[in-house]
Protein backbone atom coordinates (compact mmCIF):
# COMPACT_ATOMS: atom_id res chain seq x y z
CA UNK A 1 0.00 0.00 0.00
CA UNK A 2 1.07 3.60 -0.52
CA UNK A 3 1.64 6.34 2.02
CA UNK A 4 -1.00 8.95 1.32
CA UNK A 5 -2.89 8.81 4.64
CA UNK A 6 -0.66 7.49 7.39
CA UNK A 7 -1.88 7.80 10.97
CA UNK A 8 0.37 8.92 13.79
CA UNK A 9 2.52 5.85 14.48
CA UNK A 10 1.51 5.04 18.02
CA UNK A 11 -0.67 2.05 17.16
CA UNK A 12 1.16 -1.27 17.09
CA UNK A 13 0.80 -5.04 17.01
CA UNK A 14 2.60 -7.79 18.93
CA UNK A 15 2.89 -11.40 17.70
CA UNK A 16 3.76 -14.26 20.06
CA UNK A 17 3.99 -18.04 20.22
CA UNK A 18 3.88 -20.26 23.28
CA UNK A 19 7.15 -21.93 24.29
CA UNK A 20 5.60 -25.29 23.43
CA UNK A 21 4.85 -23.95 19.94
CA UNK A 22 1.19 -25.02 19.95
CA UNK A 23 -0.56 -21.65 20.29
CA UNK A 24 0.11 -18.44 18.38
CA UNK A 25 -1.47 -15.11 19.16
CA UNK A 26 -1.51 -11.48 18.13
CA UNK A 27 -2.75 -8.37 19.90
CA UNK A 28 -2.89 -4.78 18.75
CA UNK A 29 -3.90 -1.27 19.71
CA UNK A 30 -5.53 0.62 16.82
CA UNK A 31 -7.04 3.67 18.54
CA UNK A 32 -5.42 6.28 16.31
CA UNK A 33 -5.97 4.60 12.96
CA UNK A 34 -9.60 3.82 13.80
CA UNK A 35 -10.18 7.40 14.93
CA UNK A 36 -8.56 8.67 11.72
CA UNK A 37 -10.75 6.42 9.55
CA UNK A 38 -13.93 7.41 11.38
CA UNK A 39 -13.16 11.13 11.01
CA UNK A 40 -12.52 10.70 7.30
CA UNK A 41 -15.78 8.82 6.75
CA UNK A 42 -17.86 10.98 9.10
CA UNK A 43 -19.23 7.91 10.86
CA UNK A 44 -21.89 8.04 13.56
CA UNK A 45 -21.15 6.00 16.74
CA UNK A 46 -22.43 2.55 15.75
CA UNK A 47 -20.86 2.80 12.31
CA UNK A 48 -17.62 3.88 14.03
CA UNK A 49 -17.65 0.81 16.27
CA UNK A 50 -18.37 -1.53 13.35
CA UNK A 51 -15.76 -0.02 11.03
CA UNK A 52 -13.23 0.10 13.87
CA UNK A 53 -13.72 -3.56 14.73
CA UNK A 54 -13.38 -4.53 11.07
CA UNK A 55 -10.21 -2.44 10.63
CA UNK A 56 -8.69 -3.99 13.75
CA UNK A 57 -9.64 -7.45 12.50
CA UNK A 58 -7.97 -6.60 9.21
CA UNK A 59 -4.75 -5.62 10.99
CA UNK A 60 -4.74 -8.94 12.88
CA UNK A 61 -5.56 -11.05 9.81
CA UNK A 62 -3.00 -9.17 7.73
CA UNK A 63 -0.29 -9.96 10.27
CA UNK A 64 -0.75 -13.66 9.48
CA UNK A 65 0.32 -13.04 5.87
CA UNK A 66 3.78 -13.08 4.34
CA UNK A 67 5.44 -9.91 3.05
CA UNK A 68 3.88 -8.79 -0.23
CA UNK A 69 0.57 -10.53 0.40
CA UNK A 70 -2.73 -8.74 1.03
CA UNK A 71 -6.14 -9.56 2.42
CA UNK A 72 -9.61 -8.10 1.89
CA UNK A 73 -12.54 -8.58 4.27
CA UNK A 74 -16.10 -7.85 3.14
CA UNK A 75 -18.91 -7.93 5.70
CA UNK A 76 -22.28 -7.68 3.96
CA UNK A 77 -25.51 -7.86 5.94
CA UNK A 78 -29.18 -6.93 5.73
CA UNK A 79 -28.85 -4.10 8.26
CA UNK A 80 -28.53 -0.34 7.66
CA UNK A 81 -24.70 -0.41 7.47
CA UNK A 82 -25.09 -2.51 4.29
CA UNK A 83 -21.41 -3.34 3.76
CA UNK A 84 -17.98 -2.92 5.36
CA UNK A 85 -14.85 -3.44 3.26
CA UNK A 86 -11.35 -3.63 4.75
CA UNK A 87 -8.03 -4.19 3.00
CA UNK A 88 -4.79 -4.94 4.85
CA UNK A 89 -1.26 -6.13 4.17
CA UNK A 90 1.42 -7.98 6.10
CA UNK A 91 3.17 -4.75 7.13
CA UNK A 92 0.50 -3.30 9.41
CA UNK A 93 -1.15 -1.11 6.77
CA UNK A 94 -4.94 -1.11 6.59
CA UNK A 95 -7.76 0.87 4.98
CA UNK A 96 -11.51 0.46 5.00
CA UNK A 97 -14.94 1.89 4.38
CA UNK A 98 -18.51 1.45 5.54
CA UNK A 99 -21.16 1.82 2.86
CA UNK A 100 -23.56 3.75 5.13
CA UNK A 101 -21.63 5.74 7.77
CA UNK A 102 -24.76 7.47 9.13
CA UNK A 103 -25.83 4.69 11.52
CA UNK A 104 -26.29 5.14 15.26
CA UNK A 105 -28.24 2.15 16.56
CA UNK A 106 -28.48 1.24 20.25
CA UNK A 107 -29.37 -2.01 22.00
CA UNK A 108 -31.94 -2.13 24.78
CA UNK A 109 -29.12 -1.82 27.33
CA UNK A 110 -27.94 1.42 25.73
CA UNK A 111 -24.81 -0.04 24.14
CA UNK A 112 -23.97 0.30 20.46
CA UNK A 113 -25.79 -2.34 18.42
CA UNK A 114 -23.16 -3.40 15.88
CA UNK A 115 -24.89 -6.72 15.11
CA UNK A 116 -28.21 -5.00 14.46
CA UNK A 117 -26.54 -2.35 12.31
CA UNK A 118 -24.74 -4.91 10.14
CA UNK A 119 -27.76 -7.23 10.08
CA UNK A 120 -28.18 -10.76 11.36
CA UNK A 121 -28.36 -12.25 7.86
CA UNK A 122 -25.42 -11.90 5.51
CA UNK A 123 -21.96 -13.05 4.55
CA UNK A 124 -18.29 -12.54 5.34
CA UNK A 125 -16.01 -12.92 2.34
CA UNK A 126 -12.26 -13.14 2.83
CA UNK A 127 -10.00 -12.73 -0.18
CA UNK A 128 -6.26 -13.36 0.15
CA UNK A 129 -3.91 -12.09 -2.55
CA UNK A 130 -0.99 -14.48 -2.15
CA UNK A 131 0.82 -13.33 -5.27
CA UNK A 132 -0.66 -16.11 -7.40
CA UNK A 133 -2.73 -15.69 -10.56
CA UNK A 134 -6.02 -15.66 -8.67
CA UNK A 135 -6.69 -14.63 -5.05
CA UNK A 136 -7.87 -17.29 -2.62
CA UNK A 137 -11.45 -16.46 -1.61
CA UNK A 138 -13.63 -18.00 1.09
CA UNK A 139 -17.15 -17.08 2.18
CA UNK A 140 -19.13 -17.95 5.30
CA UNK A 141 -22.47 -16.80 6.62
CA UNK A 142 -22.30 -14.15 9.34
CA UNK A 143 -22.17 -15.94 12.70
CA UNK A 144 -23.23 -13.21 15.17
CA UNK A 145 -22.61 -10.07 13.06
CA UNK A 146 -20.46 -8.70 15.91
CA UNK A 147 -17.35 -8.83 13.62
CA UNK A 148 -14.98 -10.65 16.05
CA UNK A 149 -17.03 -13.85 16.25
CA UNK A 150 -17.55 -13.76 12.49
CA UNK A 151 -13.79 -13.70 11.88
CA UNK A 152 -13.22 -16.51 14.39
CA UNK A 153 -15.98 -18.53 12.71
CA UNK A 154 -14.41 -17.99 9.29
CA UNK A 155 -10.94 -19.06 10.48
CA UNK A 156 -12.30 -22.12 12.27
CA UNK A 157 -14.83 -23.17 9.63
CA UNK A 158 -13.25 -22.16 6.32
CA UNK A 159 -9.53 -22.46 7.11
CA UNK A 160 -9.87 -25.24 9.69
CA UNK A 161 -7.76 -23.39 12.29
CA UNK A 162 -9.42 -23.24 15.74
CA UNK A 163 -9.39 -19.52 16.53
CA UNK A 164 -10.61 -16.97 19.04
CA UNK A 165 -10.92 -13.27 18.22
CA UNK A 166 -11.68 -10.35 20.49
CA UNK A 167 -12.22 -6.81 19.17
CA UNK A 168 -13.28 -3.61 20.85
CA UNK A 169 -13.92 0.04 19.97
CA UNK A 170 -14.99 2.60 22.58
CA UNK A 171 -16.78 5.64 21.18
CA UNK A 172 -17.15 8.70 23.43
CA UNK A 173 -20.36 10.72 23.75
CA UNK A 174 -18.92 13.31 21.36
CA UNK A 175 -18.36 10.60 18.74
CA UNK A 176 -14.57 10.43 19.08
CA UNK A 177 -12.80 7.08 19.35
CA UNK A 178 -11.26 6.71 22.82
CA UNK A 179 -9.91 3.18 22.46
CA UNK A 180 -9.65 0.44 19.86
CA UNK A 181 -7.78 -2.84 19.63
CA UNK A 182 -8.08 -6.59 19.84
CA UNK A 183 -6.51 -10.02 19.82
CA UNK A 184 -6.44 -13.19 17.73
CA UNK A 185 -5.47 -16.60 19.13
CA UNK A 186 -4.96 -19.77 17.07
CA UNK A 187 -4.29 -23.38 18.04
CA UNK A 188 -1.55 -25.03 16.01
CA UNK A 189 -1.25 -28.78 15.42
CA UNK A 190 -0.91 -30.92 17.39
CA UNK A 191 -3.54 -29.31 19.59
CA UNK A 192 -3.28 -29.25 23.38
CA UNK A 193 -6.90 -29.44 24.58
CA UNK A 194 -5.98 -28.70 28.18
CA UNK A 195 -4.08 -25.56 27.22
CA UNK A 196 -6.83 -24.44 24.86
CA UNK A 197 -9.44 -24.87 27.62
CA UNK A 198 -7.26 -22.85 29.98
CA UNK A 199 -7.00 -19.96 27.51
CA UNK A 200 -10.72 -20.11 26.73
CA UNK A 201 -11.40 -19.74 30.46
CA UNK A 202 -9.19 -16.64 30.51
CA UNK A 203 -11.09 -15.21 27.54
CA UNK A 204 -14.40 -15.89 29.29
CA UNK A 205 -13.26 -14.09 32.45
CA UNK A 206 -11.59 -11.24 30.59
CA UNK A 207 -12.98 -7.71 30.98
CA UNK A 208 -14.09 -6.09 27.70
CA UNK A 209 -11.12 -5.27 25.46
CA UNK A 210 -12.10 -1.59 25.43
CA UNK A 211 -12.20 -1.49 29.22
CA UNK A 212 -8.64 -2.83 29.40
CA UNK A 213 -7.39 -0.46 26.70
CA UNK A 214 -9.00 2.57 28.38
CA UNK A 215 -7.23 1.52 31.58
CA UNK A 216 -3.92 1.70 29.71
CA UNK A 217 -3.42 -1.90 28.60
CA UNK A 218 -0.88 -2.44 25.81
CA UNK A 219 -0.89 -5.31 23.29
CA UNK A 220 1.63 -7.01 25.58
CA UNK A 221 -0.73 -6.46 28.51
CA UNK A 222 -3.63 -8.11 26.70
CA UNK A 223 -1.48 -11.13 25.87
CA UNK A 224 -0.07 -11.37 29.41
CA UNK A 225 -3.64 -11.49 30.74
CA UNK A 226 -4.73 -14.13 28.25
CA UNK A 227 -1.62 -16.29 28.71
CA UNK A 228 -1.36 -15.91 32.48
CA UNK A 229 1.17 -18.47 33.69
CA UNK A 230 1.76 -19.81 30.16
CA UNK A 231 5.31 -19.10 28.90
CA UNK A 232 5.49 -17.41 25.49
CA UNK A 233 8.01 -15.66 23.28
CA UNK A 234 7.44 -12.36 21.49
CA UNK A 235 8.19 -12.88 17.79
CA UNK A 236 7.50 -9.40 16.50
CA UNK A 237 6.36 -5.89 17.32
CA UNK A 238 5.11 -3.85 14.38
CA UNK A 239 3.55 -0.41 13.88
CA UNK A 240 0.07 -0.34 12.36
CA UNK A 241 -1.43 2.58 10.46
CA UNK A 242 -4.25 3.73 8.21
CA UNK A 243 -2.61 3.79 4.79
CA UNK A 244 -4.39 4.22 1.46
CA UNK A 245 -3.02 3.10 -1.89
CA UNK A 246 -4.77 5.83 -3.87
CA UNK A 247 -2.66 8.39 -5.74
CA UNK A 248 -3.02 11.06 -8.40
CA UNK A 249 -1.35 8.71 -10.89
CA UNK A 250 -3.96 6.01 -10.23
CA UNK A 251 -6.80 8.50 -10.69
CA UNK A 252 -5.22 9.66 -13.95
CA UNK A 253 -5.26 6.05 -15.17
CA UNK A 254 -8.96 5.85 -14.27
CA UNK A 255 -9.66 9.02 -16.26
CA UNK A 256 -7.62 7.72 -19.21
CA UNK A 257 -9.66 4.52 -19.15
CA UNK A 258 -12.76 6.60 -19.97
CA UNK A 259 -11.41 7.13 -23.48
CA UNK A 260 -11.01 10.22 -25.62
CA UNK A 261 -14.73 10.78 -26.35
CA UNK A 262 -15.78 10.54 -22.69
CA UNK A 263 -12.99 12.90 -21.64
CA UNK A 264 -14.04 15.37 -24.34
CA UNK A 265 -17.62 15.27 -23.04
CA UNK A 266 -16.37 15.80 -19.48
CA UNK A 267 -14.31 18.80 -20.57
CA UNK A 268 -17.23 20.24 -22.55
CA UNK A 269 -19.88 19.69 -19.86
CA UNK A 270 -17.93 20.42 -16.66
CA UNK A 271 -14.62 21.94 -17.63
CA UNK A 272 -12.90 20.28 -14.68
CA UNK A 273 -13.09 17.14 -12.55
CA UNK A 274 -12.87 16.21 -8.88
CA UNK A 275 -12.44 12.51 -8.11
CA UNK A 276 -12.66 11.20 -4.55
CA UNK A 277 -11.25 7.99 -3.05
CA UNK A 278 -14.00 6.05 -1.29
CA UNK A 279 -11.50 4.54 1.17
CA UNK A 280 -9.76 7.64 2.53
CA UNK A 281 -11.86 10.56 1.29
CA UNK A 282 -8.92 12.20 -0.48
CA UNK A 283 -10.03 14.33 -3.46
CA UNK A 284 -7.99 14.82 -6.61
CA UNK A 285 -8.84 17.90 -8.69
CA UNK A 286 -8.11 18.24 -12.39
CA UNK A 287 -8.29 21.54 -14.31
CA UNK A 288 -9.52 21.87 -17.89
CA UNK A 289 -5.91 22.08 -19.08
CA UNK A 290 -4.98 18.87 -17.22
CA UNK A 291 -7.98 17.01 -18.64
CA UNK A 292 -7.15 18.23 -22.14
CA UNK A 293 -3.57 17.04 -21.70
CA UNK A 294 -4.81 13.59 -20.65
CA UNK A 295 -7.18 13.42 -23.63
CA UNK A 296 -4.48 14.58 -26.03
CA UNK A 297 -2.11 11.89 -24.72
CA UNK A 298 -4.67 9.31 -25.87
CA UNK A 299 -5.06 10.75 -29.36
CA UNK A 300 -1.27 11.06 -29.71
CA UNK A 301 -0.76 7.31 -29.23
Swiss-Prot record:
GO molecular function: protein folding chaperone; unfolded protein binding
InterPro entries listed in its UniProt record: Heat_shock_Hsp33 (IPR000397), Heat_shock_Hsp33_C (IPR016154), Heat_shock_Hsp33_N (IPR016153)
Disulfide bonds: 244-246, 277-280
Keyword Cytoplasm: yes
Keywords: Chaperone, Cytoplasm, Disulfide bond, Redox-active center, Zinc
PTM annotation: Under oxidizing conditions two disulfide bonds are formed involving the reactive cysteines. Under reducing conditions zinc is bound to the reactive cysteines and the protein is inactive.
GO terms for biological process, alphabetical: protein refolding
Cellular compartments annotated: Cytoplasm
Main location per the UniProt record: cytoplasm
Family: Belongs to the HSP33 family.
The protein's role, per its UniProt record: Redox regulated molecular chaperone. Protects both thermally unfolding and oxidatively damaged proteins from irreversible aggregation. Plays an important role in the bacterial defense system toward oxidative stress.
PANTHER family xref list: 33 KDA CHAPERONIN
Record's protein name: 33 kDa chaperonin
Organism: Geobacter sulfurreducens (strain ATCC 51573 / DSM 12127 / PCA)
Amino acid sequence: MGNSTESVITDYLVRIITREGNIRALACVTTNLVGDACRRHGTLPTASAALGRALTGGVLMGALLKTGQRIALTFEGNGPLKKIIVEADANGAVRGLVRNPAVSLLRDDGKLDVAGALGKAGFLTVSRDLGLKEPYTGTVMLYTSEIAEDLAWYLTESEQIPSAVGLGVYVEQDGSVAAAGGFLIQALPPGDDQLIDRIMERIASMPPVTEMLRAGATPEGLLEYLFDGIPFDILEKRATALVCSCSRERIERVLLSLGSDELSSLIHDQGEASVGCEFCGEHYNFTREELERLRDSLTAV
